């Protein structure tokens, strides 16, 4: 395998056996592609903004004499870039401009056409990492898994009716519009509901579709024809129809008895009747009784109906028909087995007789209480299902609809037709008759994914429809000649709809920015909740459960614990959505029992037809199956199939899991419940100050780190020309350069930015000067990455043993070394904001002149009243001094005297400064001031602006210098290498005709020089414009919300070391709280004197069944052992060849591993660099379901000269005695989770009280108290601590007078209390009185 220069720095040993046929796709593509589809011009008009515009335009006036047409749209450039939007609290968006054409049709004059570009609001843009910046915060739009439009056949599984009878139903769900339901009741009548309203007999909708009773019966039933003769009745025989019936008379034909009376008619009888070609048999008169007439029988002469259709035959009716001389009677063919008379019976309970009465009935159901007119009834019915404005099945819906009805074509109209409705009813009746199956609603073929683009398009369309109504009104005005398109369109409704969606929709979520993995997982999340989806309360067990079709599409492991379990899922690693929005997963094609490299993506529906082998099936070198019988999946079931029958094979072993779960090594040895916790807890890991790659990984770490966008990745290959903490400059390879450009790429680092979760985002370069980089190489590490690999935690030396009860119940004993080495030290950045508003009494003022505040409290503020950068602040310190004017109050004589002496100012303002909240402390790292346009800027603001300007100037000058240097180098190629930069500048300033003195004979060179001179002038122009633009942005006033004059934001950074009470976890769901930080000398140590870092409880393993952690510990020990051996060799100054041989030996361990590392291709310098990076441990990759085997782990331990059992003798640090038994010791990757004791620790003496009960509030956010609940009261009762109990229930809780007296007593050093009536007792009295029961308290 070929490695690039940066990849050679540290190669992860891979134990994977299966070849990688398909690379992991770009992990954020679901978001980026969907949004791209939304904003890209689509000439077909199928997707995005174009589709929305075409669906609403053209808009015609009510009279039809004016029309507003849509021509085209384009998106402008955003005013501010992403970083500027984040600092200013703005939305990163682009203006949408649409060209509209107004046509006024006038019979008298020529038709004037006015065309104009109209502004239609701002469209938020997606950043390159798949997020949106809305009001300065990064948000993610989560994709939604909703029920696909189409038709679904279902049953109630016998739950609705007490008899347990299964009632079937069908539901037509459009993409937008009214739902149409058909359902059977317990009497087998078929009903219809529109939008889940009151049910009506289903035949009403058929009558509304202009079908008569005869046509309805014709459509749904076959007919049986009887011929009446004078002496007997003959029936036209279709033998198949007799199957399973009991003969009620002897079946005789041509003198032969085929079936005796009372016998069941079997297949043999039918076969005999067919052979003998019997087409008529005689039947007794009684046989016709109970049969149903199929058509109206009308008197030839009078035209009156003698016998109407759908009537049961009686002997009287037979006589009537005989008298009227009807020789042929048509009846409906029904039976109890597979031809139920459901529609016939429904017709009998249907009170309507014609189309009008059916339409009126539907109108009454949809609009109860309104008087129906013919026109209104017809319009309503037409609009419900047959109007393009109100109803759309969409391409997906039509495809699903036609597939469900087994039609050939899958495209068609978005509206329902008469035949659609009839066929759905027919299929539902077939299912009731026992032919066909109901659909599985949880099958992924019936659920589709709606991503950002589609949801934004729907919102945009809603906004456009609101605009349409207003436009129609305006087009009907008389003075149209004077109007232009922009006077007719008001863009507010569109902006409002878009803003509401991105700002407050349930699926627009505050991005989880704890670490790179949590970002990626959030963007790949799929939720069944949200508008048009399920609700937590109504979602049953089936919807939440893992379904066979989830395989390779949705992760069966990663889902939240709690009420959302199973409703929020994660996309599998290789899954993608197809054009219809259904999830697909890739498979390798198997051709004649040979597995090919050809990849096919299959949706859940397509997959059902194939037999698919698992990814871990053994193949020979040519891709043939080794075993005769192969483990495969078919129609959701697993089993053995012969290799000739296999159609496809899985692409990878990690195909079924999500990104989060694919990062858990030895996942295959963990119980699913613990794996779920492990996958979820990795997302809560806080980025540590010093990152450390996992010794035992899965090989997905690099992919996640690069795709998450937190690292800086080279866009083009080249040589590192300059590198410092804030920028990297790459001199691009000539073959990757565009013509006429300088060939320089500059990458800027992000420094100490606050994330959404208050963690710290900072990037640091991981390349050195002169290094060769290629496209896609990592140039700088971000938070939680180490040399371009995801590094969420730290490798800790752990031992599984009890230690004096300090690791009881999952607690952890941690060594002081971990604190000293800053292993789990994290930086947290808090943002605090102070607003100065314009109040009724005057503006609030930000100042250092605050009434009644001493000098000491103001010592950290500058003269503008704002804290200076670098100040160490603790809770209660003033960050921004602010005074608010207060209304006139009645002054006491003393105050009047003071005002007379000291002037007005002191008492007409009150202190409303921004202070550090309780429990926070840290260092001020940044201050930002935003001033409204037109408000005078204070001194500090001007200083900050000046500083930003100088920085921008410096950066741009430096950038320009770099580009200039590259240009000058190319000019030297033309003019000769001995020319100086000063001369070059002089030459470029000369006129073209003065160049003749340089004797440039070559015309080609002359052209080159001309081109370079052009570039030089262009460069100067571009940088002058950039600087001017920067200056404008820095000095312009800010657009603040109404009434706000100034906003000051202060950022405080705090360094948090690990301490008892912090929550930590491994990657296998093994979580716990630190119980004690132990001195290093007291920790257990091994024979070499190396102490362990963390002691875990061995009882945490067997019951949890997450054995993966033990295997990780062993392999981690081997990885560290090999690193130690390399370190030892480096210390002994062994030469590169010896190092090469030893490292090669480590890479060669393992049977049939896919990774082939040939260190002979590495130079000695590269080997030494590799060894330097491996000396702290050789990182290993053990991919999910394809990981290291026990034998391989033992080989690694042997190479590291460690005991193969993985257990060693430990000694007690306090006594020096060896422990009785050997202990499992090794290296495990531990994470510090974002549940820090500092954020949870809280104490209160006095504070706020609840208004009604007068009891202290609860919770840290409200600065509340600790609840003394009923169980605690029982505890005090049990010990008879009556006075303590009285104090708890009165003065410490809600006895208002008692607690104020208590203050006074404490001040007077009188330690007694006088408890009175608790306020909550008064509340109880009032509640009882509200029930009408009077209670009086008697005082004795």
From Swiss-Prot:
Pfam families: RNA_pol_Rpb2_1, RNA_pol_Rpb2_2, RNA_pol_Rpb2_3, RNA_pol_Rpb2_45, RNA_pol_Rpb2_6, RNA_pol_Rpb2_7. Keywords: DNA-directed RNA polymerase, Nucleotidyltransferase, Transcription, Transferase. This is DNA-directed RNA polymerase subunit beta. CDD domains: RNA_pol_B_RPB2. GO terms for cellular component: DNA-directed RNA polymerase complex. It catalyses: RNA(n) + a ribonucleoside 5'-triphosphate = RNA(n+1) + diphosphate. GO terms for molecular function: DNA binding; DNA-directed RNA polymerase activity; ribonucleoside binding. Transmembrane segments: none annotated. DNA-dependent RNA polymerase catalyzes the transcription of DNA into RNA using the four ribonucleoside triphosphates as substrates. The RNAP catalytic core consists of 2 alpha, 1 beta, 1 beta' and 1 omega subunit. When a sigma factor is associated with the core the holoenzyme is formed, which can initiate transcription. Coiled coil: none annotated. It is an enzyme of class 2 (transferase). Its EC number is 2.7.7.6. It comes from Baumannia cicadellinicola subsp. Homalodisca coagulata. GO terms for biological process: DNA-templated transcription. Belongs to the RNA polymerase beta chain family.
């Amino acid at each position: 395998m070929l490695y690039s220069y940066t990849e050679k720095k540290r190669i992860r040993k891979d134990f994977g056996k299966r070849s990688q046929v398909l690379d992991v796709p770009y992990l954020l593509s679901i978001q980026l592609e969907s949004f791209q589809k939304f904003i890209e011009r689509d000439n077909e008009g199928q997707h995005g903004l174009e589709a929305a515009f075409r669906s609403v335009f053209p808009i015609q006036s009510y009279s039809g004499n004016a029309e507003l047409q849509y021509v085209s749209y384009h998106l402008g450039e955003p005013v501010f870039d992403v970083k500027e939007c984040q600092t200013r609290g703005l939305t990163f968006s682009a203006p949408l401009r649409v060209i509209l054409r107004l046509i006024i049709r006038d019979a008298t004059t020529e038709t004037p056409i006015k065309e104009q570009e109209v502004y239609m609001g701002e469209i938020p843009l997606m950043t390159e990492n798949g997020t949106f910046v809305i009001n300065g915060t990064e948000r993610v739009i989560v994709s939604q898994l909703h029920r696909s439009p189409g038709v679904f056949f279902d049953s109630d599984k016998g739950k609705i009716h007490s008899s347990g009878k299964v009632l079937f139903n069908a539901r037509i769900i459009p993409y937008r519009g009214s739902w149409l339901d058909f359902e059977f009741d317990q009497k087998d009548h078929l009903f219809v509901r529109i939008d889940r309203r009151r049910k009506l007999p289903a035949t009403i909708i058929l009558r509304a579709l202009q079908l008569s009773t005869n046509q309805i019966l014709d459509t749904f039933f076959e007919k049986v024809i009887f011929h009446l003769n004078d002496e007997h009745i003959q029936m036209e025989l279709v033998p198949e129809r007799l199957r399973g019936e009991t003969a009620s008379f002897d079946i005789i034909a041509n003198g032969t008895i085929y079936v005796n009376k009372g016998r069941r008619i079997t297949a043999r009888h039918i076969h005999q009747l067919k052979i003998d070609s019997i087409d008529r048999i005689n039947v007794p008169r009684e046989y016709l009784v109970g049969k149903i007439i199929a058509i109206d029988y009308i008197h030839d002469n009078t035209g009156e109906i003698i016998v109407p259709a759908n009537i049961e035959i009686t002997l009287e009716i037979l006589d009537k028909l005989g008298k009227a001389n009807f020789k042929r009677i048509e009846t409906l063919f029904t039976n109890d087995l597979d031809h139920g008379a459901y529609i016939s019976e429904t017709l009998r309970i249907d009170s309507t007789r014609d189309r009008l009465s059916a339409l009126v009935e539907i109108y009454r159901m949809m609009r109860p209480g309104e008087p129906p007119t013919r026109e209104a009834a017809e319009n309503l019915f037409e609009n419900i299902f047959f109007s393009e404005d109100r109803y759309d099945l969409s391409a997906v819906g039509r495809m699903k609809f036609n597939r469900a009805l087994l039609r050939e074509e899958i495209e068609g109209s978005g509206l329902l037709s008469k035949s659609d409705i009839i066929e759905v009813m027919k299929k539902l009746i077939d299912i009731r008759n026992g032919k066909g199956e109901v659909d599985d609603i949880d099958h992924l073929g019936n659920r589709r994914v709606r991503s950002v683009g589609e949801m934004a398009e729907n919102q945009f369309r809603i906004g456009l429809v609101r605009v349409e109504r207003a436009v129609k009104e305006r087009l009907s005005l008389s003075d149209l000649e004077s109007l232009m398109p922009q006077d007719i369109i008001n863009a507010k409704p569109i902006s409002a709809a878009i803003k509401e969606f991105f700002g407050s929709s349930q699926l627009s979520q505050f991005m989880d920015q704890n670490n790179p993995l949590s970002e990626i997982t959030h963007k790949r999340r799929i939720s069944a909740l949200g508008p048009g989806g399920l609700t937590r309360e109504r979602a049953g067990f089936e919807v939440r459960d893992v379904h066979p079709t989830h395989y390779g599409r949705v992760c069966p492991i990663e889902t939240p614990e709690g009420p959302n379990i199973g409703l929020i899922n994660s996309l599998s690693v290789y899954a993608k959505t197809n054009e219809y929005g259904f999830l697909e997963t890739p498979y390798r094609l198997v051709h004649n029992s040979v597995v090919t490299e050809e990849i096919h993506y299959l949706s859940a529906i397509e997959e059902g037809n194939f037999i698919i082998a698992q990814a871990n099936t053994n193949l020979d070198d040519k891709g043939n199956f080794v075993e005769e019988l192969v483990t495969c999946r078919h129609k959701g079931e697993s089993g053995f199939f012969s290799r000739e029958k296999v159609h496809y094979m899985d692409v990878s072993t990690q195909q079924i899991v999500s990104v989060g779960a694919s990062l858990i090594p030895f996942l295959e040895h963990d119980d699913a419940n613990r794996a779920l916790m492990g996958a979820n807890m990795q997302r809560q890991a806080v980025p540590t100050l010093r990152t450390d790659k996992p010794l035992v990984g899965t090989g997905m770490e690099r992919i996640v780190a690069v795709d998450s966008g937190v690292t800086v990745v080279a866009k083009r290959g080249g040589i590192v020309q300059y590198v410092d903490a804030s920028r990297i400059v790459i001199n691009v390879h000539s073959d990757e350069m565009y013509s006429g450009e300088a060939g320089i790429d500059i990458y800027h680092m992000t420094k100490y930015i606050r994330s959404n979760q208050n963690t710290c985002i900072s990037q640091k370069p991981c390349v050195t000067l002169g290094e060769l980089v290629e496209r896609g190489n990592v140039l700088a590490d971000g938070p939680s990455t180490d040399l371009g690999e995801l590094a969420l935690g730290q490798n800790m030396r752990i031992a599984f043993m009890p230690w004096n009860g300090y690791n009881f119940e999952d607690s952890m004993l941690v060594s002081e070394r971990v604190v000293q080495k800053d292993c789990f030290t994290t930086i947290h950045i808090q943002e605090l904001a102070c607003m100065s508003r314009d109040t009724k009494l005057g503006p609030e003022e930000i100042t250092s002149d605050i009434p009644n505040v001493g000098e000491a409290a103001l010592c950290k503020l500058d003269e503008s009243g704002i804290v200076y950068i670098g100040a160490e602040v603790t809770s209660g310190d003033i960050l921004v001094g602010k005074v608010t004017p207060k209304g006139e109050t009645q002054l006491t004589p003393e105050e009047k005297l003071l005002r007379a002496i000291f002037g007005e100012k002191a008492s007409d303002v009150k202190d409303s400064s921004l202070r550090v909240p309780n429990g926070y402390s840290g260092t001020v790292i940044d201050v930002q001031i935003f001033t409204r346009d037109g408000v005078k800027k204070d001194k500090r603001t001007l200083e900050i602006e000046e500083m930003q300007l100088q920085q921008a100037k410096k950066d741009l000058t430096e950038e320009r210098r770099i580009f200039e240097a590259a240009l000058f180098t190319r000019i030297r190629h033309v003019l000769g290498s001995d020319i100086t930069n000063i001369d070059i500048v002089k030459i470029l300033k000369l006129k073209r005709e003065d160049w003749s003195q340089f004797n440039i004979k070559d015309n080609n060179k002359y052209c080159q020089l001309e081109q370079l001179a052009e570039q030089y002038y262009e460069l100067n122009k571009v940088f002058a414009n950039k600087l001017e633009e920067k200056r404008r942005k820095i000095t312009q006033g800010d657009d603040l919300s109404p009434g706000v004059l100034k906003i000051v934001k202060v950022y405080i950074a705090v360094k948090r070391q690990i301490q008892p009470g912090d929550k930590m976890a491994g990657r296998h769901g093994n979580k716990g709280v630190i119980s004690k930080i132990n001195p290093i000398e007291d920790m257990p140590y091994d024979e070499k004197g190396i102490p362990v870092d963390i002691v875990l409880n061995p009882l945490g393993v067997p019951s949890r069944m997450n054995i993966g952690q033990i295997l990780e510990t062993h392999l981690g020990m081997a990885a560290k052992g090999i690193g130690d051996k390399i370190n030892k060799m480096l210390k002994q100054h062994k030469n590169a060849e010896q190092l090469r041989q030893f490292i090669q030996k480590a890479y060669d361990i393992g049977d049939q591993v896919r990774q082939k590392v040939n260190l002979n291709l590495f130079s000695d310098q590269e080997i030494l660099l590799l060894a330097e990076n491996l000396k702290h441990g050789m990182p290993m990759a053990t991919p999910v379901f394809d990981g290291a085997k026990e034998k391989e782990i033992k080989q690694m331990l042997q190479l590291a000269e460690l005991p193969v059992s993985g257990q060693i003798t430990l000694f007690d640090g306090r006594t020096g005695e060896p422990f009785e038994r050997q202990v499992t010791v090794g290296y495990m990757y531990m994470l510090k989770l974002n549940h820090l004791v500092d954020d949870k620790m809280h104490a209160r003496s006095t504070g706020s009280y609840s208004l009604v009960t007068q009891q202290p509030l609860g919770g840290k956010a409200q600065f509340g108290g600790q609840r003394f609940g009923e169980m605690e009261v029982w505890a005090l009762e049990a010990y008879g601590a009556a006075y303590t109990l009285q104090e708890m229930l009165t003065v410490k809780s809600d006895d208002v007078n008692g607690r104020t007296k208590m203050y006074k007593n404490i001040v007077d050093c009188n330690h007694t209390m006088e408890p009175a009536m608790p306020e909550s007792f008064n509340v109880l009295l009032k509640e009882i009185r509200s029930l009408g029961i009077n209670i009086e308290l008697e005082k004795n």
